[in-house]
Amino acid sequence: MLTLPEYNEQIPNVRSLLTKWAKVERIQDVQDGLQLDVRLKTDTLLELHIYYDHVYHVPSIKFRLWSLDTEEDISSLRLLTLSDSELRSILNLGTFSVTLSTDMEMKSVYYYINNCDTDANVGSDVEHYLTRWISLYIRIFDLNFVP
């Protein structure tokens, strides 16, 4: 577990690591976290939100994957769902689980990475907690990510 002040102290380090990720097109600071647009493939965009979970006191991820469809010079984005084989082929979930839920504040649907086992996966040592966390969890989206 990580207190909000500890999280806020470490989030600039995560931002610094993610700016080195070649696939990031945009990174924005938001309240208690970061929002990224990541080009996973030529026609696949990852909308990624890193935020502090005030209930579990751990960093968390919510995301959406979009497929860029172009037909007769008209482009549109299509939200990918877990039933899309395209989405399942992109995610490297391993033992991680995701759930689909509505973000009431944003009035939008997102996938959430289950954060119940965060401390077991990352360890409870506060020093460099977020660096260890991002190094593990970002690999869900890019196995080649190296912090």
UniProtKB/Swiss-Prot annotation:
GO CC terms of this entry: phagophore assembly site membrane
Main location: membrane
Subcellular location: Preautophagosomal structure membrane
Phenotypic consequence of Y110A: Reduces the formation of the ATG12-ATG5 conjugate
Residue positions of the active site: C116
Entry-linked Pfam families: Autophagy_act_C
Disruption phenotype: Impairs the formation of preautophagosomal structures.
Main enzyme class: transferase
GO biological process: autophagy; protein transport
Membrane topology note: Peripheral membrane protein
Gene Ontology molecular functions: ubiquitin-like protein transferase activity
Membrane recorded as keyword: yes
UniProt effect for mutating T99A: Forms the ATG12-ATG10 intermediate, but reduces the formation of the ATG12-ATG5 conjugate
Keywords: Autophagy, Membrane, Protein transport, Transferase, Transport, Ubl conjugation pathway
Enzyme Commission identifier(s): 2.3.2.-
UniProt cross-references to InterPro entries, sorted A to Z: Atg3/Atg10
Homology family: Belongs to the ATG10 family.
Function: E2-like enzyme required for the cytoplasm to vacuole transport (Cvt), autophagy and nucleophagy. Acts as an E2-like enzyme that catalyzes the conjugation of ATG12 to ATG5. ATG12 conjugation to ATG5 is required for proper localization of ATG8 to the preautophagosomal structure (PAS). Likely serves as an ATG5-recognition molecule.
Binding partners and assembly: Forms homooligomers. Interacts with ATG10. Interacts with ATG7 and ATG12.
Note, other: Kluyveromyces marxianus proteins are shorter in length and have a more ordered secondary structure than their S.cerevisiae counterparts, which might contribute to the superior thermotolerance and solubility. K.marxianus could be therefore useful as a new model organism for further elucidation of the molecular details of autophagy.
Designated name of the protein: Ubiquitin-like-conjugating enzyme ATG10
